[in-house]
């Protein structure tokens, strides 16, 4: 969520002093992964990789120690993930843990639209002031106080909105691990919610695009556990249910966007004259003729759904690879994929059920049928559901090649159903979605072995955001955690069987300044959850090139026991300071 709030720093003054002129104290903790040590002599070591969803963003690496008898985690040392070789990070949001024990995340927002950045397009920026608060994204590069021409000479939005990966090799030293940080340009550029690579073969990675006109993407790496090269696909859906009724049911096919490597895409960002590539280097923009929903384009141009409407576009010769990676969403729509997903959020996988689950936070606007002027055109109007401000979670079965084949709603929120004044005993406008159901689902995680889907909210339609447990067999919905007013529950993730303990990761982001820690967020978990009768899996012995094997999967089948409570790993001051390089 985009806030950039100026929260109280009272709780931090003792640690960082009262002069905050060169420091931003973040309350934007988001996804936190727990990674297993590669050091056989130190199985109690666990690594936490922490997202901070700021402009600019930061990823910190915490060395944790796990208590063998209780499973409790404590911080021993703090490191950072250095993305300076990839121009730093902006607004790192949700994430996942790869099957090869690395951290995967992405950059979601915080940079201007590339159409506005291109001086050859209508409505292009003419002054640095046009960037608004996105100027904050340039502080770590020292460009935030320059004029527009100077910024354009040194920076482009195409540097951001990529998948990132953090790998930790502590096999030689726990105190000085090798932390490798990289962006994967091969996987395409979007408003990335998160990448998710399923832990089975053939290996497939899914990427969700949190936009008003988003796409769902699938990446197949050339080599397992190596995301530096592969083939990208975009989802095309055919609606099989009645238009404008319910959450919709769809058949799925996959449209190829071609093959690319990280190195190839990086090279394409810069033209032969040393300047950065622009939108009109890849696409020619044509004129629309006729109505808004059923307009026509000149010969050679295609009506293409883009953010804020639809355009007539023509791909320039030889620009397939550049467009497929730098303008993935628009190129996907151009070649016939579906680009009407509205706030396509978290995604997760059930190994036993062989299904993916993903959240659509707000099932409305571009997902509604024939919504003229808001991203629809008759040629690309693939999705037409009933408006639902409270959002839905969808289920998507996989075939033998681990590709999604169909989509149907699993659970949808209900707008203004239960919440009448006589039942709630209050008339809060912040409970406009049924309080006994989900509202604007954001992060999802599957508890393999327990057959439970975890659903975290990012909503203004519940007074307090919640984390829910959806029981797949009974369809029962249980609220397992709520956060204080003004806060979002972020980074919901099930860290499974680390030395016989499991953790439901859950951060508290941007709470009301009157709440705990003077408005600071927290990094923590529900648990520890004891996994009885299971082989402890705490050491990653294979490194980046080996998938975790069968012991951990078997351990997930054990029943949950023991006391579960919310534990703060570390006060936010340790995990939430960004020293601005200005």
Give the positions of each predicted feature.
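Compositionally biased amphipathic helical and low-complexity segments enriched in hydrophobic
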Residues: 116, 550, 581-582
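Cleavable C-terminal sorting propeptides in eukaryotic secreted/cell-surface proteins
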Residues: 558-582
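C-terminal low-complexity, Ser/Thr- and acidic/Pro-rich disordered "stalk" regions positioned immediately N-terminal
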Residues: 544-558
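Conserved small-residue
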Residues: 1-547
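Generic alpha-helix initiation/capping and coil-helix boundary signal
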Residues: 88, 552, 568-572
């Amino acid at each position: 969520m985009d806030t950039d709030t100026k929260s109280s720093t009272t709780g931090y003054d003792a640690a960082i002093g009262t002069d905050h002129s060169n420091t931003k104290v973040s309350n934007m903790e988001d996804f936190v992964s727990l990674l297993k040590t590669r050091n056989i002599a130190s199985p109690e070591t666990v690594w936490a990789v922490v997202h901070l969803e700021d402009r600019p963003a930061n990823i910190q690496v915490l060395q944790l120690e796990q208590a063998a008898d209780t499973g409790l985690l404590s911080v021993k040392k703090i490191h950072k993930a250095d993305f300076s070789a990839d121009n730093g990070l902006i607004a790192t949001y949700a994430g996942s843990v790869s099957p090869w024990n690395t951290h995967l995340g992405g950059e979601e927002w915080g940079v201007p639209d590339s159409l506005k950045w291109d001086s050859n397009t209508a409505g292009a920026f003419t002054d640095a002031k046009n960037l608004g608060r996105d100027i904050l994204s340039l502080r770590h590069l020292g460009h935030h106080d320059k004029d527009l021409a100077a910024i354009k000479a040194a920076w482009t939005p195409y540097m951001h909105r990529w998948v990132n990966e953090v790998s930790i090799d502590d096999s030689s030293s726990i105190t000085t691990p090798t932390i490798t940080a990289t962006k994967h340009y091969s996987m395409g550029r979007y408003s990335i919610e998160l990448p998710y690579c399923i832990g089975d073969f053939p290996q497939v990675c899914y990427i969700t695009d949190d936009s008003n006109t988003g796409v769902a993407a699938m990446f197949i790496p050339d080599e397992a556990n190596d995301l530096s090269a592969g083939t990208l696909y975009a989802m095309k859906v055919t609606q099989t249910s009645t238009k404008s009724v319910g959450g919709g049911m769809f058949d799925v096919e996959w449209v190829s966007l071609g093959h690319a490597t990280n190195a190839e895409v990086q090279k394409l960002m810069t033209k032969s004259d040393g300047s950065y590539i622009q939108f009109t280097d890849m696409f020619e923009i044509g004129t629309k003729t006729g109505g808004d929903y059923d307009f026509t384009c000149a010969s050679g141009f295609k009506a293409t759904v883009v953010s804020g409407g639809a355009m007539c576009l023509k791909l320039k010769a030889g620009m397939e690879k550049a467009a497929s990676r730098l303008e993935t969403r628009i190129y996907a729509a151009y070649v016939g994929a579906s680009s009407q997903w509205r706030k396509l959020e978290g995604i997760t996988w059930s190994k036993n059920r062989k299904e993916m689950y993903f959240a659509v936070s707000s099932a409305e606007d571009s997902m509604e049928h024939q919504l003229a002027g808001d991203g629809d055109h008759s040629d690309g109007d693939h999705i037409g559901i009933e408006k639902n401000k409270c959002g839905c979670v969808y289920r998507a079965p996989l075939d033998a090649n681990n590709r999604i084949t169909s989509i149907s709603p699993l659970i949808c929120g209900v707008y203004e159903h239960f919440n009448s004044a006589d039942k709630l005993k209050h008339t809060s406008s912040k409970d406009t979605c049924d309080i006994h159901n989900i509202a604007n689902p954001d992060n999802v995680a599957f508890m393999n072995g327990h057959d439970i889907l975890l659903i975290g909210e990012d909503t203004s339609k519940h007074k307090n955001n919640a984390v829910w447990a959806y029981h797949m067999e009974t369809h029962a919905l249980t609220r397992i955690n709520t956060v204080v007013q003004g806060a979002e529950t972020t980074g919901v993730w099930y860290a499974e069987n680390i030395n016989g303990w499991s953790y439901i990761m859950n951060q508290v982001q941007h709470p009301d300044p009157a709440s705990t820690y003077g408005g600071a967020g927290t990094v923590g978990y529900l648990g520890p959850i004891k996994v009885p009768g299971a082989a402890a899996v705490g050491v990653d012995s294979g490194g980046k090139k080996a998938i975790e094997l069968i012991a951990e999967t078997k351990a997930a089948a054990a029943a949950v026991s023991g006391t579960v409570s919310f534990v703060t790993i570390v006060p936010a001051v340790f995990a939430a300071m960004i020293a601005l390089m200005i």
